[in-house]
Amino acid sequence: MTTTATPPQAIQVSVLRWAPPIVHGLVRDLRVRWALEEAGWPYRENVVSPADQASAKYRELQPFGQVPAMECDGLKLFESGAIVHHIAERSPALMPEEPAARSQVTAWMFGALNSIEPPVMMFNVLDMIYQGPKGEEYNGIRTWVAAWVESRLDVLAGVLEGQEYVLGRFTAADVLLATVLRILRDTDFVRKRAALAAYQQRCEARPAFQKALRDHLANFAAHAPKN
């Protein structure tokens, strides 16, 4: 597919009405917002409540009742990776023109979601969300998952040595990789790897990311529960 700079006419992104502060900056609508900002595509929010998520109408858009989902000129899409890929396929800001280079971007997008995010999410659940007993069995599992995370990040750090982004220039792969790394923000996994720390800072310093994050957080602030 040849990329085009012409944006669709009507884009709506479904986002959570509110979420606890522990996940602010992590909910996956941030990826979609960032990709849209990089592409220069204007969009409007469809703010959904828990009741909306459970409704038959919303399940037609997102079968699992999650966010994000996107409606784009009549097309309905769900899953953040699929949405970012759809945007990238149509935006030269996120995807190069040359076929082999495009394939490499796609490979790294899948790598972010299939090879790196699963152990990262598992560690996050164990370390920050799980509230059950934390005895010898828990510690053994946590140690094993931490080693899994370390091994994946060692590979990524090696790839990033000496270059700004995973494929040289910024692409949609970096949108997914950087948002996966954000999940580890309360750990030292990224901080202790200079190449990864610099990479994440570089990605998050981009104006498009900053705008996406501001809008993501502003939505939660606007709908925060009243005390």
Placement of each model-derived feature along the sequence:
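Positions that flank functional sites
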Residues: 51, 199, 218-219
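GST-like domain detector, emphasizing the conserved glutathione-binding G-site
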Residues: 1-143
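Terminal-tail/helix-coil boundary detector
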Residues: 214-227
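GST-like fold's C-terminal all-alpha helical module
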Residues: 2-4, 112-205
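Short, solvent-exposed turn/loop segments enriched in Gly/Ser/Thr/Pro and often Arg
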Residues: 49, 172, 216-217
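Active-site-flanking alpha-helical
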Residues: 88, 180-181, 213
